[in-house]
Amino acid sequence: MTNAESRTVLRILDANANRAGEGLRTLEESARFILNDLSLTERLKTHRHDLAVAMRRWNRFQLIGSRDTPGDVGTGVQTASEQSRADLSSVIAAATTRTQQALRCLEEYGKTADSEFAACIESIRYQCYATFRELELKMAGLNARSRKLVEARLYALIACEPNADYLKARIAELVDAGVDVIQLRDSSVDDRTLFEQAKLGAAIAAERDVLWIINDRADIAVASGADGVHVGQEELPVDAVREVVGPERLIGLSTHSIEQVRLATRTTANYIGCGPTFPGKTKSFDRYPGCEFLTQVSDAERSGELTLPAFAIGGIGLGNVEQVAQSGIGRVAVTGALAPHDGLHQTAMGMREILERVPLRITPDSSDVCPLPND
């Protein structure tokens, strides 16, 4: 190559080494702070380190000396999509694409002067393909659950069934009736039974495209492959539960006052249950915050103070769901009203019709991923 050609290659290598390093660091931050995934974070850091080692085969001062940012015509070429990112997944998608392309450029132009360098970059590139795949799939799973959650209207709580066939039938009738989220709640069975039904329910729910939540038991939620866990004010703190279930799964938290709602927004909870609204048959309480509490929650949503989906709970059925809707809440969690009976489908559809009159302020666009722990 001529001196001019060699200098051009150095410019290309310098630009793409910077681009690949920046992309890898962006992805490392996502694995570290969004997913809290130690393995992915370590692997991305290793890729970044391996790239730095490979670049040592080139004289750093020659690389820097070849750099001509003011004279680079490419710095002024931009597209509209480069200036915005729809959500965190789009940040990751852009970074993986940019990194892969930069590595390929390093490999191809490196072949003109150093075949061993090119081979090193090729190895890094293939390792990155595997890492990036895992990273994007984990982000996709996290986003899919969050999107389903914020679009949900009807949440049913059920107990364990006598056998697998009964559980399949129970889930099927709820899904067919328009239920979006199903929680398995049963303190009367042993752990093995709860786990087996939780695992079966998780598989069925995934097939039917509904969310499957386990009450109280974060360990069983993880072991069974459930979408999340719901805890009360007396159970493990939300941030401790997050340590168990990881960033991919949803966490719901029961709240009984506007003060507890405000505290919930400072945790990594994904949604809240608000109540009890009315007296019900499954649980008894000393006091019922009622629709006055729901109005406070709705006001908090309207003001932007609350950015978590809120489900009214407690004694709600077709006969009183209108009061919930008038409070400004368009999501409910139900037990008795959706217990097996001949009119279950009509009850669920009737409740849903009323709830859908209430606009959802917490939308997929405003809550694309689960809340993240503080850095």
Swiss-Prot record:
Primary enzyme class: transferase
Binding positions for Mg(2+) per the UniProt entry: D216, E235
Residue span of region Thiamine-phosphate synthase: 128-375
Note on how the cofactor is bound: Binds 1 Mg(2+) ion per subunit.
E.C. no: 2.5.1.3
Record-level Gene Ontology MF annotations: magnesium ion binding; thiamine-phosphate diphosphorylase activity
InterPro entries linked: Aldolase_TIM (IPR013785), ThiamineP_synth_sf (IPR036206), ThiamineP_synth_TenI (IPR022998), ThiD2 (IPR041397), TMP_synthase (IPR034291), TMP_synthase_cyanobac_bac (IPR016229)
Pathway the protein takes part in: Cofactor biosynthesis; thiamine diphosphate biosynthesis; thiamine phosphate from 4-amino-2-methyl-5-diphosphomethylpyrimidine and 4-methyl-5-(2-phosphoethyl)-thiazole: step 1/1
UniProt KW keywords: Magnesium, Metal-binding, Thiamine biosynthesis, Transferase
Reactions performed catalytically: 2-[(2R,5Z)-2-carboxy-4-methylthiazol-5(2H)-ylidene]ethyl phosphate + 4-amino-2-methyl-5-(diphosphooxymethyl)pyrimidine + 2 H(+) = thiamine phosphate + CO2 + diphosphate; 2-(2-carboxy-4-methylthiazol-5-yl)ethyl phosphate + 4-amino-2-methyl-5-(diphosphooxymethyl)pyrimidine + 2 H(+) = thiamine phosphate + CO2 + diphosphate; 4-methyl-5-(2-phosphooxyethyl)-thiazole + 4-amino-2-methyl-5-(diphosphooxymethyl)pyrimidine + H(+) = thiamine phosphate + diphosphate
Organism superkingdom: Bacteria
One Gene Ontology term, aspect cellular component: cytoplasm
Binding site for 2-[(2R,5Z)-2-carboxy-4-methylthiazol-5(2H)-ylidene]ethyl phosphate: G315
Similarity section: Belongs to the thiamine-phosphate synthase family.
Annotated protein name in UniProt: Thiamine-phosphate synthase
Species for this entry: Rhodopirellula baltica (strain DSM 10527 / NCIMB 13988 / SH1)
Taxonomic path: Bacteria, Pseudomonadati, Planctomycetota, Planctomycetia, Pirellulales
Gene coding for it: thiE
